[in-house]
Amino acid sequence: MLALGAAALVVSGLLAACSASDEGGGAARLRGEITFGVLAPLSGDMAERGQDLVDGAQLAAAELNDQGGVLGRQVKLAVEDGGCAPATGEQGATRLAAKSVAGVVGGLCENAAVAAANAVAAEGTPFLVSSARADRLIEAGLPSVFPMEGTVYQEALAAVHWMGYRSAQRVVVLADGSPASQRLSGLVTDRVKADGLTVSRQSAEANRPDLAGLVSTVTAAKADFVYWTGAAEPGGRLVSALRQAGYTGYFMASSESDSPEFLQAAGAAAEDAFLTTAAGPRLLPAAADWAARFKDRFRRDPGRDAMQAYDALRAMAQAVRQAADTAPSKVVDNLPRLEGFTTFTGTLRFAADHSLRYDNYVIAQVRGGTFTLASKLRTD
C-alpha cells in the first residue's frame, strides 16, 4: 500500500488570504471550503502525465476561486496517487471517498480507473474520469461515473466519416495483433462495409509486423485509403514502406500513433498522413489562451491530461452550482444536464449510458513534421 503521508496531498486552489479581498475590496470573501478529489498516477512510469493532470485541476481550482469559488466557498483539492494498477487505483479512490469530497476527477490508466470507479461508485460519489478510455467504464454501468473520453466505437465512426469525406472507394484496414487494434479494425471494417465501400482487412503480429505482406495487401486491393490501427512505431515504418512501394493514396492511423515515435519512424513519409485522435491543446486554437495561462503558472506547456482535468473540475463545479448542494446524489443528477457548459471541444453532454454524446475525437494531419488540426468533426 502507498504511504499515506506521501500519497495524500491536500492542495488549495489558492490560499484563503489570496482568494478573499480585504474589507472594502471588490470581491466577496469566500466562507468555508469545498473539496474535490483528484486521482492520478504520481509514481511510476506515468508520473509525468499524472502530474500534468493534477496541474490542470489546480489551475481550474485557482480560477474558480478567483471567480468567487463554488457556492461562495473556497475550492480545495485532495490529491491521491492512484497508480496504474487496479489495487492502487482502488486504494487511492477509497482514501478520497473517506475524505467526503464533493466529487472526484482524474483517472488515467484504464485498469486503475476502472477499479477506482467501482470504489468511488460504492459510496455514490460523482466521478468524472478525465483521461482513461471510456469503454470498460461504460460497460460497468456505474451510476455516479462519467467518462470524459470517447469510446473505441466513436473513434471508428470518426475514421469512417473521414474516409467518406475524402471520397474513399477502396479501403484497406490494417491491424497489429493487440486486442485494442483488432477491435478498432473490426469496427471500422464493419462500418465501411455498411456504407457500401470495398474494404479489405488484414492483421499482423504486434511485435514484428510483416510490412512487406501489408504493402502487398494494399497493392493487390488497389486501395485509395489505408487505415492503420496498431502501434505508433510500426505505423510509421508502414507508411514509409507504402510510399517507397509507390502508394499515392490516403494514409490514416489511429490514436495509438499520436506519438513522436510515429513521426520518427516515418520520416518524410509522414507528411500529409491523417490521424484519428482525441483533441489536445496543441491541436485546438480555442485552447491557446488557456495554454498560455497554464505555462505562465507551471513554466511548461500543458498536455492533454491537464486540459481534460481542467475541464472535468469545472464541470464538477458547475454540477454543484446547479444542485446548490454538495450532496452526492444531487451532484450526480446534475452532471448529465449541465446548462450552457462547454469544454475546449464544445458542448459537454452525456448520453443515457454516460458516454459522451459529442465525443472529443478530431482529425489531425502531419504538416511540416508535426501534428496539426485538420478537422474538429463537430459542428456545435
Please annotate each region the language model reported.
Residues 21-22, 49-53, 68-142, 206, ...:
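Beta-alpha junction/loop-to-helix N-cap segments that form part of ligand/metal-binding clefts
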Residues 23-38, 69-74, 97, 164-169:
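Immediate post-signal peptide segment of exported/extracytoplasmic ligand-binding proteins
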Residues 25-58, 67, 80-87, 176-181, ...:
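Extracytoplasmic "Venus flytrap"
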Residues 91, 135-136, 143-246, 281-289:
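Extracellular/periplasmic Venus flytrap/periplasmic-binding protein
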Residues 239-310, 371, 377-380:
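Extracellular/periplasmic periplasmic-binding protein-like sensory domains
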Residues 298-306, 317-370:
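Segments of small-molecule ligand-sensing domains
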